[in-house]
Amino acid sequence: MQFSGVVLILISMTLVNFVFFETKVEAGKFGKCKPNICAKTCQTEKGKGMGYCNKTECVCSEW
């Protein structure tokens, strides 16, 4: 009974690691625009008030 519990824990840990690894890879593909860097870039370099991420590109507001 204890052996099957250990095997079950090992299998579940492997599945959890696989799911989190896949999530990181998927987020990396679409994570090109970083909101904090976008906002700073719009404020300092372009003289705009705010910046936000629209999918993968940084968009500066007009005001």
From Swiss-Prot:
GO cellular component, one term: extracellular region
Major localisation: secreted
Keyword check for Signal: yes
Organism superkingdom: Eukaryota
Signal sequence range: 1-27
Entry's Gene Ontology molecular function annotations: potassium channel regulator activity; toxin activity
Keywords, alphabetical: Disulfide bond, Ion channel impairing toxin, Neurotoxin, Potassium channel impairing toxin, Secreted, Signal, Toxin, Voltage-gated potassium channel impairing toxin
Cell location: Secreted
Tissue expression per record: Expressed by the venom gland.
Disulfide-bonded cysteines: 33-53, 38-58, 42-60
Transmembrane segments: none
Free-text comment on this protein's domains from its UniProt entry: Has the structural arrangement of an alpha-helix connected to antiparallel beta-sheets by disulfide bonds (CS-alpha/beta).
Miscellaneous comment in the UniProt entry for this protein: Negative results: does not block voltage-gated sodium channels rNav1.4/SCN4A, hNav1.5/SCN5A, mNav1.6/SCN8A and rNav1.8/SCN10A, and Kv1.1/KCNA1, rKv1.4/KCNA4, rKv1.5/KCNA5, rKv2.1/KCNB1, hKv3.1/KCNC1, rKv4.2/KCND2, rKv4.3/KCND3 and hERG potassium channels, when tested at a concentration of 0.5 uM.
Summary of the function given for this chain in its UniProt record: Reversibly and voltage-independently blocks voltage-gated potassium channels rKv1.2/KCNA2 (73%) (IC(50)=196 nM), hKv1.3/KCNA3 (50%) (IC(50)=508 nM), Shaker IR (30%), rKv1.6/KCNA6 (22%) (at 0.5 uM). Interaction of Ts15 with Kv1.3/KCNA3 is stronger than its interaction with Kv1.2/KCNA2.
Family: Belongs to the short scorpion toxin superfamily. Potassium channel inhibitor family. Alpha-KTx 21 subfamily.
Protein name: Potassium channel toxin alpha-KTx 21.1
Organism: Tityus serrulatus (Brazilian scorpion)
